[in-house]
A protein has these predicted regions:
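Aromatic/His-enriched, Gly/Pro-containing loop or helix-boundary segments
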Residues: 79, 119-123, 134-138, 252, ...
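Active-site-proximal, well-structured secondary-structure segments within enzyme catalytic domains
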Residues: 126, 130, 159-165, 169-219, ...
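Short histidine-centered catalytic/ligand-binding loop motif
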Residues: 230, 237, 252, 354-361, ...
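Short pre-active-site segment immediately N-terminal to the catalytic Zn-binding motif
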Residues: 361, 468-488
């Protein structure tokens, strides 16, 4: 049987990754992983090697990681009902298998025996470190728990996966369900023209207004929310947008309040089962903070250091509003701080950040980014033409074109400038849409390897995703300075 999610080809045929293929592909991947784990467990303890234990464990679930990784990526950038349903059906099975690996007593015995072998001292520092981290991962995942406690731990892991997934779905769905339609253009005073035009076109696309009688649609997506909170003169408009942002995942069909309480309780139970005082201690135990108390101390210390400057700035903004309105201002409301801070900044420094946008088209920003990194690291970054098909849709890509999951997505190849060797490639998906979760992130789809053992280099395949200003009509996407910083951050 053909398994598109498990296809190891470097370039992904995204249109073949349909919701219908999720169950058979992940079922097959779990079956392969179970057989690989069984092989590790069945070997005699007297003849263990690195390759037959830790090396084999690293590769045991490769197909599952590949397939599920692609599925989770599509869940983040292209959430749709049939796909969500298929993921919901398979998530418990994936979690059950993943939890069972560190809870497998025979596998744990084999790994501990291998870690105590004399040959470990002759391994490279990288492999020794991998052994240490793997053992720590297993202990952190319940390997040392008594057998009668392991089922409870596995059930907690399963419930956490389901509830955190539902939490994220509620955030996306409640964000998409919220809209504010403005009928009076006077309410939009102060908004940049680009934000007004984007809101007008969004309203048209969603059935509000006409060319002759326009309406303006605002949502809780950052590119719609942020300009209003920073520039809109209407206090009422800013307040409604702020109240909307506070309503995401709160009340109604997409309420997350009960889920949050359940997730916190499950995390606390998990931490106590593993011998930690609280979940914060568990989460920080292998990080620089070392404990929840240390992390909280750091946060409180930082808070105490910055609070005086913050209060000083807010007092200056309060006085500024008082001066400009001629009215007594006891304190600033949350929907006022960004607006009045921006007006004060413009007056103090005679600088409007919006004036930078014409210089920050996505194309120019990417060109500048690549120029900097080419000089730093001796690489070249080259765009490739792209083509997008709908899931299940067959089509022939133009020669040299790379298939992507959405028409907005770009694709680049990265080569060594001197040798021309292909080091890796990456996708870039910069603009918001209803099927895409909020925020910005980078991730890998397949991890490359340097040349070794006579094998050539395996290039890396990664991705960068954001939710930045969209093109307006036939005009290019012009970014804010903060959005430019985000692109540099994700690429770095």
């Amino acid at each position: 049987m053909n398994h598109p999610y498990l296809d190891p080809s470097f370039l992904v045929s995204w249109s073949r990754l349909t919701p219908e293929a999720i169950r058979p592909d992940i079922t097959e991947a779990i079956s392969r992983a179970k057989e690989n784990i069984r092989t590790i467990c069945d070997q005699p303890l007297e003849s263990l090697t690195y390759e037959s234990t830790f090396g084999a464990l690293e590769k045991a679930s490769e197909d599952l990681h590949l397939g599920w990784g692609r599925i989770m990526h599509l869940d983040s950038v292209n959430d749709e009902p049939a796909q969500r349903e298929a993921i919901g059906e398979m998530l418990p099975e994936v979690v059950t298998f993943s939890s069972s690996v560190p809870l497998n007593p025979r596998l744990w015995t084999v790994l501990k025996a291998a870690a105590s072998c004399d040959w470990v001292e002759d391994l490279s520092p990288v492999r020794q470190r991998f052994i240490q981290e793997t053992l720590a991962d297993f202990r952190e995942s319940g390997a040392d728990l008594p057998d009668d406690v392991k089922p409870e731990y596995a059930e907690i892991e399963a419930q956490l996966s389901l509830k955190t997934k539902k939490f994220a779905e509620n955030v996306l769905d409640s964000t998409n369900a919220w809209e504010l339609i403005v009928e009076d253009e006077a309410e939009l005073s102060g908004l940049p023209d680009s934000a007004k035009e984007a809101a007008r076109l969004d309203a048209l696309a969603n059935g509000h207004g006409t060319e002759e009688a326009p309406r303006w649609r605002f949502t809780q997506k950052f590119t719609s929310l942020q300009p209003v909170m920073q520039f809109a003169d209407s206090d009422s408009l800013r307040r409604r947008m702020w109240e909307g942002s506070c309503s995401i995942g709160k009340g109604g069909e997409y309420d997350n309040e009960a889920l949050i309480a359940e997730i916190l309780e499950l995390r606390d139970r998990k931490a106590h089962l593993l011998g930690y005082g609280c979940f914060a201690d568990y989460a920080t135990s292998r990080r620089m903070a070392g404990s929840g108390a240390n992390a909280l101390k750091f946060i409180n210390d930082l808070h105490d250091k910055v609070k005086p400057s913050f209060l000083k700035d807010m007092e200056a903004v309060r006085r500024y509003k008082e001066e400009k309105t001629g009215k007594s201002v006891e304190k600033l409301s949350p929907w006022e701080t960004g607006y009045w801070s921006e007006k004060r900044r413009r007056e103090l420094y005679a600088f409007d950040e919006e004036d930078l946008r014409p210089y920050y088209s996505v194309e120019k920003v990417m060109e500048g980014l690549f120029s900097i990194y080419s000089g730093l690291y001796g690489i070249t970054v080259t765009p490739r033409p792209t083509v997008a098909f709908k899931p299940g849709e067959s089509g022939e890509a133009p020669e040299g074109a790379v298939e992507v999951w959405h028409p907005d997505v770009l694709f680049y190849e990265l080569h060594d400038a001197e040798s021309g060797e292909h080091l890796g490639s990456f996708y870039a998906d910069w603009h918001p849409r209803d099927s895409k979760r909020a925020g910005a992130w980078m991730n890998c789809l397949s991890v490359g390897e340097p040349p070794h053992g006579g094998k050539p280099r395996a290039p890396h395949l990664g991705l960068m995703v954001g939710n930045m200003t969209k093109p307006v009509g036939d005009k290019p996407a012009l970014l804010s300075h903060r959005e430019v910083e985000t692109i540099f951050h994700e690429f770095g």
